[in-house]
Structures are given as C-alpha cells and as structure tokens.
C-alpha cells in the first residue's frame, strides 16, 4: 500500500484548528479536490488532496489543534491502469 500524507501547508501561523473532513475514509479523491478545512484567526482554509487516490486514514479531527507541516491524514495512491 502506497500512502501519501495530506500535509497542512504553512498558513503564516504556527497553529490552526481542524474543522472538518469533506470526504470520509474509503472515498475516492482527485488531486486538487478539497478534502478538509482548517480555521486560522480570521479565515477558514480548505486543504487540497495532493494526489489521486482514496482517503485511507484521518489523523486530525474537528476541534484538534494542528501545526503547519503536520499530516492530517493519508491518501492511498490510485493503482496504475492495467493495459
């Protein structure tokens, strides 16, 4: 299984509050899809999927404080199409 972390990018503040997942484990995602939301002072920010695949694990949950650079969850890479 090839897992890719969903990493919280640097938002200009060391911490953010995790708000919600837009997808649930087992659901497919495409690169660039919004998969989660975090809140920083004065704004809510969407977190995008870094790759195509399936959300496999959530590490952050609503109300959690999360740090820039920390993984929020993992996406299993979509297997290559068979020719």
Kindly give the residue locations of the regions a language model identified.
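Actinobacteria-biased recognition of intrinsically disordered, low-complexity terminal regions
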Residues: 1, 82-83
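Acidic, low-complexity mobile loops and tails
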Residues: 1-34, 46
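Short, small/polar residue-rich loop motifs at catalytic or cofactor-binding pockets
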Residues: 14-17, 42, 52-53
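Residue-level signal for short amphipathic helical patches enriched in basic/charged
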Residues: 24, 42, 50, 61
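Short hydrophobic beta/alpha edge segments that flank linear recognition/processing sites
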Residues: 30-48, 67-81
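Short peripheral tails and domain-boundary helices/loops at the edges of structured domains
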Residues: 52-67
